[in-house]
């Protein structure tokens, strides 16, 4: 007789499909992951606030403008933030 050369798609047709593993991951989620996210969120909230800008140092290898940008006045980057991003000449005055 000819032997069928195929294998079945499932290795086990009955039984528990990872019940103990699912309980382990559920326990790790509620005991480890969620409190860790809560502590990190609390840490970010407590340290949020206004930060002073560092002193501008005109390094010659940064903020090089070989040609103007094609938007605005040509000196500001596309997502320029005047509170954080300096121009080649220094920070903008508020």
Curated annotation (Swiss-Prot):
Belongs to the cytochrome c oxidase subunit 6A family. Residues 1-9 form a transit peptide. Component of the cytochrome c oxidase, the last enzyme in the mitochondrial electron transport chain which drives oxidative phosphorylation. The respiratory chain contains 3 multisubunit complexes succinate dehydrogenase (complex II, CII), ubiquinol-cytochrome c oxidoreductase (cytochrome b-c1 complex, complex III, CIII) and cytochrome c oxidase (complex IV, CIV), that cooperate to transfer electrons derived from NADH and succinate to molecular oxygen, creating an electrochemical gradient over the inner membrane that drives transmembrane transport and the ATP synthase. Coiled coil: none annotated. Pfam families: COX6A. The chain crosses the membrane at residues 22-46. It is a single-pass membrane protein. This is Cytochrome c oxidase subunit 6A2, mitochondrial. Residues 47-94 are mitochondrial intermembrane. Its main location: mitochondrion. Keywords: Membrane, Mitochondrion, Mitochondrion inner membrane, Oxidoreductase, Transit peptide, Transmembrane, Transmembrane helix.
